[in-house]
Amino acid sequence: MRLIGNRLMKILYFAWLKEHTGHSFEELQLPDGVDTVGALIPHITEQSPGHGAALANLDAVRVAVNRVYGDLATPITNNDEVAFFPPVTGG
């Protein structure tokens, strides 16, 4: 993966996403032109087969940006924290 620019962001993985990626978090350079969660996902999934498997079914993945629930259209910028996790239910 060729990344352009020097903007770092922290990517967090929880539950089975962590198991697939092999990481609880990673710091990545935010590629130029990537300004939403949806635009970031292809850059994550090309890192390894595990990353691709973790984000293969986006209907089963939730996202938060800077600890606020979001979706694929949520804007991201340098130094943001993006978390991917399975749906959470209360009870």
Segments from the language model and where they lie:
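Ubiquitin-like/PB1-type beta-grasp interaction modules and other compact soluble beta-rich domains
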Residues: 1-90
